[in-house]
Amino acid sequence: QPIICFLLKLFLIGSSQLFYVPSVCAQDSSSRSEEDREKYVSSQPWQEYLMELSEMEDFEQTAWEDYEEELEELAQHPLNLNTATRDEMEHLPFLTPSQVEDIQAYLHRYHGMKTMAELALIPSISWYQRQLMNSFFYVADETPRKQFPSLKNILKYGKHEVMGMVKVPFYERKGDGKGTDGYLGYKYRHGVRYQFRYGDYVKMGFVGAQDAGEPFGSGRNNLGYDFYSFYLQVRKLGRWKNITLGRYRLHEGMGLILNNDFSFGKLSVLSSLGRTTSQIKVHSSRSSANYLQGAAATYTLLKGLDLTGFLSYRKIDATLSDEGGIKTILKTGLHRTRREIARQDIASNTLVGGNINYRHQGWHIGATGFYTSFSLPLMPEKVQLYKRFAPEGDAFWNVSVDYGYISHRWTIGGETATGDCGAVATLNAASYLVSDHFSLTAVQRFYSARYYSLFSNSFAEGSSVQDENGVYVGATWSPGSRWTLTAYSDFAYFAWPKYHTRQSTQSWDHLLNILYLPSRSWTLGARVRYKEKAGNVTGRLRFYASVTTKNWSSKTSVDYTKYREGNAGSGTGNASSNDTQNASSCGYLLNENIGYHWRWLRLQGSFGYFHTQDFASRIYAYEPGLLYQMSFGSYFGEGIRYALVARS
């Protein structure tokens, strides 16, 4: 049996290989027992539950690799719900701040939980949220540690994890051919990951990654891999809540000036907005774009009053203008050809700033500010209309104030920001729990066309926090214990022309999601979305049915997409277009996911047939994978996608 277990860890049927070797020096009360782990493992992966609480098409705008890395790591090292702090719970994007308050109140009133099934006694926690929490939490009678552990215990009881990954394609790509424009490296993608951790107190590790086509151990990569990430994080060290060195990510306020962490789409707004917690996370993924490099720390000055400081210096990829300035900052992280390598680490960026926030009896207020500079000036091509207000120069600053209030029924949050641009951006959200079965959410945002922040990432219909004025209204209703209806409507207006438009545009976006639970094992769902943006109309329809037992899970889904393109008169398309008729296309996907769990063995399989007329009618689907390797892909044309995965 140990030999079979090792081989299954090493082999992925299809196109990849991966090894994952956890090593535990010893065990103490901070380690979760195998019995507890086995009790709460579900035969259906958490990714599929999360998919139903999110919008598939919004994953294109999400740093999904960073997001999946963090949640997968938490799934591998779940938290004891009885001892988890409010900040730790708020790291999960599917829990609202008011739901976290309800959980904390329940734990305080009843002195903890005996089983995870008690979550059903909290009316504000939905069925899907309970299933997700089973993947990231467990219940045990553990006493929270009162002081930071000794170095001796950290070294003795800490856990070492080593993981390697190799992807072998069974096809030839255009760039694999020899020639001046071909890739300089081989077609295999591989990487290595090491991490040492002791509970929630110490985390240290590194990541080495190589994309297919990149040279390994030669040229600029004389140290082997093209990308490395090193990090060290210490938490709960007296008044020091967090000390992080190396590569890290930050989320301050609601992201109007600083957020290089992930953010979600509109459907998840119903659960994610209202949080303004300052968060420092290690950068342990393969992504070479959204990270800072240096040091960041949070210190508690007084009860409820925290101060965060951060400093970063890193190299960046860029294309240069004829004058020698930065025309475009590149974030692909690909260095396969001579042209891509010539743009590697061509400039540098320095960032220094801080955040201070205060919390008391549900109220919170904070302020964030930073100064950033580049070794070469930013010189965008402002002759293009949509780049007219792009940042220009070599030094920039931004400041913001965030605020809010959280209670059982109300969740209010907002942030207002400005900077050297002299313009203003503001985002404000409010959610009211009318009853245990009905809640309303409203979001207002105004982002001036002249406003910019180089590190912003927040709620928006467009691709950036700039030139947008909109209102969002959403609701969640549970008319009975078996039914849940979620809906939203969002309107946005863009005063300045966007890419491929010639005038002001607007968008309407509507969604309705219906969930029905005929029994504890069966789930039926439907989702319809209608979106009109700059004259282009996209409609999406989805039906699915899933069954989950102790060892088996199965999910069948049907997706249909209809797209209609607006004409040039509506302000869309290329300016040179002479088409007088609107183009339209459609597509569909039939997909099946099956999972099996038995003791240490987990098997997953997916099979899908898709048929779309073009890229505009593309379909999105979840595809299982090994640790930190699964994906949500978009497919167009006609074809079959399948995957078989074995894990232990």
Give residue ranges: language-model regions.
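Compositionally biased linear targeting/interaction segments
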Residues: 26-216, 220-233, 238, 247-251
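Short loop/turn motifs that connect adjacent beta-strands in outer-membrane beta-barrel proteins
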Residues: 152-159, 201, 234-243, 252, ...
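Exposed, low-structure sequence patches enriched in small/polar residues
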Residues: 183-187, 345-380, 388-648
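Outer-membrane beta-barrel proteins
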Residues: 209-227, 281-288, 342-345, 417-419, ...
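Outer membrane beta-barrel
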Residues: 222-317, 438-453, 602-615
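Aromatic- and glycine-enriched pocket-lining scaffold segments that form the walls
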Residues: 289-338, 345-357
